[in-house]
Swiss-Prot record:
Assembly notes: Heterodimer of GatD and GatE.
Family from the record: Belongs to the asparaginase 1 family. GatD subfamily.
Gene Ontology molecular function: any one: asparaginase activity
Reaction equation(s) it catalyzes: L-glutamyl-tRNA(Gln) + L-glutamine + ATP + H2O = L-glutaminyl-tRNA(Gln) + L-glutamate + ADP + phosphate + H(+)
GO biological process: amino acid metabolic process; regulation of translational fidelity; translation
Keywords, in A-Z order: ATP-binding, Ligase, Nucleotide-binding, Protein biosynthesis
Function: Allows the formation of correctly charged Gln-tRNA(Gln) through the transamidation of misacylated Glu-tRNA(Gln) in organisms which lack glutaminyl-tRNA synthetase. The reaction takes place in the presence of glutamine and ATP through an activated gamma-phospho-Glu-tRNA(Gln). The GatDE system is specific for glutamate and does not act on aspartate.
Enzyme class, UniProt record, top EC level: ligase
Residues annotated as domain Asparaginase/glutaminase: 75-404
Organism ancestry: Archaea, Methanobacteriati, Methanobacteriota, Stenosarchaea group, Methanomicrobia
Listed NCBIfam families: asnASE_I, gatD_arch, PRK04183.1
Protein name listed in UniProt: Glutamyl-tRNA(Gln) amidotransferase subunit D
E.C. designation(s): 6.3.5.-
Active site per the UniProt annotation: T85, T161, D162, K238
Length: 415
């Protein structure tokens, strides 16, 4: 056949037409990634195949230094590109979505951004967000602080959605910011007609020039292209694998909303206003912490592994109000007696941990565990990593974990 992996072809068979990029496939079928983003496998026997465009690895876009620029009289906004779907297209070699594009490419694709702000771009990473690590959070927070010190009026962080809530939580603890720091992503790549990248990026840029001096996440609020929600970085969670409105505030309202057509921002909750606090960076983390999910019948030796392996902190995602089976309690006590903080959270996600209602919970507290209040388990993990990076004193770490640092705890839960 006169086509290769990565070429764009048209297949006509049995009255149907399939057009897309050739993906790796077995010998029996040709697999193409269509413009919709979905894959189609077609038996080539009896099919008419037309080569539309040659495209090989040599033509695949490469990450490059960023020189994105807007208009000089507008507020200065820096886009820090870390990769993810908002900065991705279909890879010409495999047909899969890869993170190869920079802030320059985002601005080229969405020129409306330059009407809102003087855009500068900087590539930090070009990775899919499942490859994020604690060391990257440390570098990212440092890069944000550097851009603010250099005069940026707002920061946008282009990030993959899968682990965005972890990164947003990390920066919420590591930074006090006088300007907006806005995480934004996309559930669907720019190649797809249903992509949410343009609207999300435009709304994020408007928030970046607003008075909301918080680390926040801006994503679709509904499945329609009507408005985006502005979430605190510590109260947001990805609640669906693929829907455009996957991000929701948990145990809290969003900070507010931004209308896509009017760009008007409506705030719901109090927030730190622009220039109300000085820039402060505390980006030391202790990566040797873990989030442990309890399930019925789970062997308590799971905790022994972490204790014996030298882990510095543990977050347990318990049932209901924050429970584990009674045979886990001795190992919780062993951990705390060895100076390892243990934080109890709930796999219910919504609601508040309270280990004073039932006997099991009371025994967990007697073993030295700390109630995680209404913190999301993932946020509690990141906060514990940060707390351990700030102090070696167990009592001080406990006090940090019980304190509301970056909106991660609410006085009362809504639902």
């Amino acid at each position: 056949m006169d086509f290769e992996l990565g070429d764009r072809i048209r297949i006509e068979k049995d009255g149907n037409t399939y057009e897309g990029i050739v993906m790796p496939s077995n010998t029996d079928h040709i697999v193409v990634k269509m413009v919709s983003g979905y894959n189609a496998g077609v038996d080539p026997e009896g099919a008419s195949i037309t080569l539309l465009e040659k495209a090989g690895p040599k033509n695949a876009p490469k990450a490059k230094p960023d020189k994105a620029k807007g208009q000089k009289k507008l507020p200065k906004v820096t886009i820090l590109s870390t990769g993810g779907t908002i900065a991705s297209k279909v890879d010409y070699r495999t047909g899969a979505v890869t993170a190869q594009f920079s802030a320059d490419d985002i601005v080229d694709a969405i020129p409306e951004l330059t009407e809102i702000a003087d855009i500068n771009g900087r590539v930090l990473y070009n990775i899919l967000s499942e490859n994020m690590k604690a060391e990257y959070w440390t570098e990212l927070a440092g890069a944000v602080a550097q851009e603010i010190e250099n005069g940026a009026d707002g920061i946008i962080i282009a990030h993959g959605t899968d682990t965005m809530m972890y990164s947003a939580a990390a920066l919420s603890f590591m930074l006090k910011t006088p300007v907006p720091v806005v995480f934004v992503g996309s559930q669907r790549s720019a190649d797809r007609p249903s992509s949410d990248n343009a609207m999300n990026a435009i709304c994020a840029t408007k928030v970046a020039v607003s008075d909301i001096a918080e680390v926040c996440v801006v994503m679709h609020d509904t499945t329609s292209d009507d408005r985006c929600a502005i979430h605190f970085g510590t109260k947001v969670r990805k609640m669906h694998t693929s829907r455009r409105d996957a991000f929701q505030s948990i145990n809290s309202d969003p900070i507010g909303y931004i209308d896509h057509s009017t760009h008007k921002i409506e705030t719901v909750l109090p927030f730190s206003k622009r220039d109300s606090q000085k820039l402060e960076l505390k980006n030391t983390l202790e990566p040797k912490c873990s989030l442990v999910k309890f399930v019925p019948g789970a062997n308590p030796d799971v905790l022994s592994y972490y204790i014996d392996s030298g882990y510095k902190g543990l977050v347990i995602e318990g049932t209901g109000l924050g429970h584990v089976s009674t045979d886990w309690i001795p190992n919780i006590k062993r951990a705390t007696e060895n100076g390892i903080p243990v934080i109890m959270t709930s796999q219910c996600i919504s609601g508040r941990v309270c280990d004073r209602v039932y006997d099991t919970g009371r025994d967990i507290l007697k073993a030295g565990a700390i109630e995680g209040e209404d913190m999301l388990p993932e946020v509690a993990l990141v906060k514990l990593m940060w707390a351990l990076g700030q102090s070696n004193d167990v009592d001080e770490i406990k006090e940090i974990m019980r304190s509301n640092i970056g909106h991660e705890m609410t006085d009362s839960t809504l639902k």
